[in-house]
């Protein structure tokens, strides 16, 4: 991933449609980025915007959140867009909290909902 800016995309199950719509509507801006995503989210993003450069990692509950956290800690992820569903309990909630903690510790831009992502994306330099 060296040499190009990397954006991580993650969405909880109830927010995957929103992430797919976000990717489709923002293909031009997203095309400037190398994208890493958890498995299912990455698949949905590719279905919606097949020309994007998306690397799919494991599904969130199977370690994908932790994989993205590791990439944040090594400086390989430059920004995070994570569409969180606050109304549905997540069995891997501790992984989600750890991921958000790493984004804060390493001071990378992070959007947790569509409204923030829409404002953040154009301000990021790819």
From Swiss-Prot:
GO terms for molecular function: methylglyoxal synthase activity. Substrate binds at residues 12, 16, 38-41, 59-60, 92. GO terms for biological process: methylglyoxal biosynthetic process. The keyword Lyase applies. One of its GO terms (cellular component) is cytosol. SMART domains: MGS. The active site is at residue 65. Its EC number is 4.2.3.3. It catalyses: dihydroxyacetone phosphate = methylglyoxal + phosphate. It comes from the Bacteria. InterPro entries: Methylgl_synth, Methylglyoxal_synth_AS, MGS-like_dom, MGS-like_dom_sf. Residues 1-126 form the MGS-like domain. Keywords: Lyase. The keyword Lyase applies. HAMAP family: Methylglyoxal_synth. Catalyzes the formation of methylglyoxal from dihydroxyacetone phosphate. Belongs to the methylglyoxal synthase family. NCBIfam families: MGSA (TIGR00160), PRK05234.1 (NF003559). This is Methylglyoxal synthase. The gene is mgsA.
């Amino acid at each position: 991933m060296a040499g190009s800016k990397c954006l991580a995309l993650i969405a909880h199950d109830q927010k995957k449609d929103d992430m797919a719509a976000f990717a489709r509507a923002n293909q031009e801006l997203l095309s400037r980025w190398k994208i890493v995503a958890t498995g299912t989210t990455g698949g949905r993003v590719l279905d919606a915007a097949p020309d994007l450069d998306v690397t799919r990692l494991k599904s969130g509950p199977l370690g994908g959140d932790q994989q993205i956290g590791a990439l944040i800690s090594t400086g390989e992820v430059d920004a995070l867009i994570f569409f969180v569903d606050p109304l549905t309990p997540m069995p891997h909630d501790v992984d989600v909290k750890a991921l958000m903690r790493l984004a804060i510790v390493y001071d990378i831009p992070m959007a947790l909902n569509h409204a923030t992502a829409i404002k953040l994306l154009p301000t990021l330099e790819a």
